[in-house]
């Protein structure tokens, strides 16, 4: 499924920023359960990060996360603020945890986007994440594509 999503995502990416190559990773133990991740776009630098990470976490859900840091956080923050209502309506949550590598959508890591006062205020990174439940397995590729399109659309302002 992730390989298929990778091709869909490549067709949807229209940003000015070169997205890098898609990467699919898998493992057996994210908090005790197997996982698969697709990163596209995928720009991971020491100071600057731009990634849209789609994760399947066995027994939990699919999630799609926009991960920004450094110059990409500065570039995208005004667009996120301007499109906040639409992102919230699509089910996106904002990262509030201190560990940028925690992906599970739980209260210690994420809050509803419309429940926070200031987006990205004083934080070293910014993450927006939405989930697609396993009860929507058949629809998941389409729904993840729509969520990706919403995030990727911000790259064209």
Please give the residue ranges for each predicted region.
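Short, internal acidic amphipathic alpha-helical interface segments
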Residues: 69-120
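Soluble extramembrane domains of integral membrane proteins
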Residues: 20, 28, 34-36, 49-50, ...
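Long, solvent-exposed, polar/charged low-complexity segments
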Residues: 1-10, 107-157
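Aromatic- and glycine-enriched beta-alpha-beta binding-site module
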Residues: 31-86
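Charge-rich, low-complexity N-terminal segments
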Residues: 1-44
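A structural detector for beta-sheet-dominated domains
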Residues: 41, 95-97, 131
């Amino acid at each position: 499924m992730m390989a298929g999503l990778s091709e869909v995502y490549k067709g949807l990416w229209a940003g000015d920023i070169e997205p890098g190559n898609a990467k699919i990773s898998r493992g057996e133990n994210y908090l005790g359960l197997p996982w698969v991740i697709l990163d596209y776009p995928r720009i991971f630098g020491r100071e600057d990060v731009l990634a849209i990470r789609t994760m399947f976490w066995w027994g939990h859900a699919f999630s799609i996360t926009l991960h920004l840091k450094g110059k990409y956080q500065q570039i995208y923050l005004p667009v996120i603020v301007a499109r906040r209502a639409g992102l919230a309506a699509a089910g996106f949550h904002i990262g509030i945890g201190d560990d940028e590598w925690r992906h599970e959508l739980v209260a210690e890591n994420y809050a509803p986007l419309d429940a926070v006062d200031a987006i990205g205020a004083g934080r070293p990174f910014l993450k927006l994440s939405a989930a697609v439940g396993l009860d929507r397995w058949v629809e998941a590729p389409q729904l993840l594509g729509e969520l990706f399109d919403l995030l990727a659309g911000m790259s064209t302002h």
